[in-house]
Amino acid sequence: MALVDAYKKVVDFLNNNGYSYFIIGGIAAGTLGEPRVTADVDVDIVINKKDVPDFLGKAAKAGFKVPVKKCLKSVEQVGVFQISFSDYHIDFIIASTDLESQAYKRRKSIQLHGVKAFFPSPEDLILMKIIPGRDKDLLDAKGVIIRHKGKLDIKYLKTWAMKLCDEAQDMRIWQALNKLLKD
């Protein structure tokens, strides 16, 4: 069993059950930017916390390994949860920010590994990668910038970077974006 099988399984599950989602993390970075190794599937999902138990039940019936108590505790504490398929983890981040709300309106359907899945726009993935600020995330953002050079909505990027900086009262995101756009 390979990571691609876990990816296909979760995408089919989400699509067949009508969940609103998009793929993020290393798979999105490799699809929209430069390919890189990743060991899991990361999903941003629109779901009310009260609906997570039903989601977990459906996932278990679909063949995923679901540590229900651990998932529910994690949802309450940090708004994320993890299930698995074979040896691969699938991390779900519950959408909760204005940027995620906007990204859902702009998401794109992309055929990858024989299944259609939703991915954020290149601009939204760049912003989502800059926010944590880890080296690998900044490299992912740079890869997306390089791949979409001349096609990015720079005004959108800068508007959201400034908004995020205002909310955080920290200019790091603005500075990181401008550095990545210049390099």
Q: Language model features by range: what are they?
A:
Residues 1-183:
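Compositionally biased terminal segments of proteins
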